[in-house]
């Protein structure tokens, strides 16, 4: 287990370094400036030692020499401040460029992920990786640049300056150093696994909170508050446990290294005092050595804290990099062509598909749709209606068989051009933040106001839009929170009305609309579907009576096929389903 964790940590670090290497210019400047800053800082104890010797040395106090030293110190302090400012600017540039790159790649990957990945992971957990985990990583990376590099340079620089004063004392310091390194290394291995668990649980908690907040009406309607709170408490307890363990191991790093570093300071003081008494060094040089001992041990204390932050940062980076490295949707074939304008002909031949290998869903599915035909798909929940739509849009690839559009197999078409030829209105509405005008024009950004208004009128959305205070300029809240479900659905229909592609998919498109509005929408749909191949998924059979073909599906297969009158005459599954829905009105 330890070996696996260590390998994961190293692998993540290598991947992070690949991002950092893109900005080698800033990195090189930062390292050089760190060396300059440390060199200037370490020169100060030399000057202080010289000043001490001019005060405690034989004869009168050398005030002139002291003033010269003070002027040098003032210049050095000023240069150090400037160098540190520029170094921090370089570090910030590296950190936030890397964060930008990682977030961009993560978002690009999300848009390329196959639907099966998005179906298997909650969107809250994915958002947590891109936002919270990247923020945690940024904090650790910035601290790593600002303190880790400077600390390392300070350690080696201090030893060099100490060697110029007393080789024996410098060697004594080097002998004690490995103890501090061993302590920090031992604890670092313990903290990484805990921070990884903490990060994963934080993502789980974020996903759960977003799920509950987004569906609070349903939670309250079913009196599910106690169960939700119990589940949240369980996740929260685990997060607390992992957080405490991570903090426990990280908290003992600093005291442990401080103890070892105190030994270093004491060693320099004792050995230096005896050396000064013996005449090996002056009092001023002893003062310089004690200052160096303090500066030498200080980075170990800081680095121990940095290591803790880096453990957390690497754990978080591992989660977002894991997302970036997920297999993307199977790319278009190299010889794939664009479907310029579909003629509406669709053929499915011996199509097989399953989400899970051992559970067959679509089996030996065959269908031939002529241009302009309206195809309705009905059946019980789980029969494969939405799955069939997913295959037509190539959100999923079939296991075997052939699907052709305009006599061209889907695999020979680019996904974008295929999907551009479909207009979709789904049961689940999605509106982006922005004005109503922007949402309607989503598929046609260059649409004129006249075109947008015409589309809204065709979908019967114009009336409620004009009643809003800002009309078409009304800004929609997140996911259309300030609109009713029916109003959101009307805007989604208007969006398709504006583009009017050659083929349409209506998946429970009127499920959230009242009966009165539904009649108007059906008339609008009838006009919209004229001359366009249309696939209509519906539970309410009143919406599909005018379809050219009605497919009755069960367990992934077509069990009945025909128009409304033909299926009623067969007195089969469709007839029973239809009669059950209209029993009260008959």
Question: Residue locations for each model-derived region?
Answer:
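ABC-type nucleotide-binding domain
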Residues: 332-333, 339-586
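Hydrophobic transmembrane alpha-helices
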Residues: 75-79, 178, 209, 259, ...
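Transmembrane helices of ABC transporter permease
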Residues: 22, 26-39, 43, 50, ...
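Alpha-helical segments in transporter systems
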Residues: 17, 25-46, 69, 73, ...
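Cytosolic ends of transmembrane helices, especially the final helix of ABC transmembrane type-1 domains
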Residues: 224, 248, 265, 295-323
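Membrane-integrated ABC transporters
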Residues: 1-41, 56-73, 87-91, 95, ...
